[in-house]
Amino acid sequence: MAKEHSVYELNRIQQYIMQMRPVLKKEALFSDGTKDYRNPTEPEAGEKVTIRFRTGKNNVDIVWLCTDCEHYKMKKTESDREFDYYAVEMTMGEEPFYYYFEVASGLLHVFFDRYGVSKERRDAYRFCIIPGFSTPEWSKGAVMYQILVDRFYNGDPANDVLTDEYYYIKTPSKKMEDWNQCPSDFSVGEFYGGDLEGVRQKLGYLQNLGVEVIYFNPLFVSPSNHKYDIQDYDHIDPHYGKIVVDEGELLQSGTTDNSKATRYVNRVTNRENLEASNAFFAELVREIHARGMKVILDGVFNHCGSFNKWLDREKIYHANGGYEDGAFLSKESPYRSFFGFRDENGWPDNTSYEGWWDYDTLPKLNYEDSEELYDYILGIAAKWVSAPYYVDGWRLDVCLLYTSPSPRDRQKS
């Protein structure tokens, strides 16, 4: 006669059997945003999207696609020698659609997101579909060449940054006389003289390499060689473009006051220099396009630089005249709302502005409280993809870390 088991014993037996399943093959779990796992990849609002997920063959019990509010059980639709494939169909709304996956194998539950397998849900790494957002066909699979201009090629020595031209991050600017000399450990103020004329002279070389897209690191006015601390979004840095009026003095040894760096002030604020540099860039883009290549710019819109004309911590624009007071100098500045200040009684020379990762050379842009800033940046995005520049697109720096123009607004601009 067969032995009868209590409910408790049956539960223990069931748990034992579940635990005896093959070990979960975490390395087999996979999904991404390509057409193999999301079809269509760039849906419109109201369109149905098939989302797929891969597992090891006969290795899991259940796969769910998860949103903030719901778990949707996925159906096994296909298998091959090594893998099973699960799918579910979702209808897109108007808003971004965020999702991740949960996988059950016996008593083991794991999650899968853009960063892979995890024991816990990670909202920051969810997959995202933005209905109505698409990327141009020319960008898909294109051969892209990234250029940090200062380190590419010096085509015009007349625009080189000079030694002692100005002072930045506890060091004076330095012109590197030997192109082959290795940069120092802290080289933000060391300049090798690469410029846009150098890029123009090497376009044939780039074309022969098979380059289809040139992606420029930031080109706008900035005191550093990397230029992720932008001083003026409206103009190409004359040190990369054209210096047609070159007047003023270098800093005296030991001087740190950039309002006295009159050579630098003239170079980066003189209207003739700025307009000539913008015009040269427009010509360069036309020549790049004539060779069948595209151009992408680097959009650094999360933060700017302490030299920026909206803040003007260095009093470069205040000393030059013809510019509004920066928000560092005056609470009445028209740019006051562009930055978040912790001390409302800190003016003049209010150092309490919020910096990205607390770096005072990288003031955080305050989109949350400034509709004017929001509109200004959208205008900048539109300016450089319009006549006479006709840039083909933007790469957005640290775009996940700031509240800024929405993806849909950026696309429209």
Where are these regions (language model features)?
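Glycan-association/targeting regions that enable binding to alpha-glucans and other polysaccharides
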Residues: 2-140, 145-146
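Intrinsically disordered, low-complexity acidic/polar segments
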Residues: 60-62, 97, 110, 154-156, ...
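Substrate-binding/active-site clefts of carbohydrate-active enzymes
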Residues: 142, 149-212, 218-388
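Short beta->alpha junction loops/turns
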Residues: 370, 399-401
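Alpha/beta-hydrolase fold catalytic core
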Residues: 385-392, 400
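Conserved small/polar residues in nucleotide/adenosyl-binding loops
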Residues: 402-411
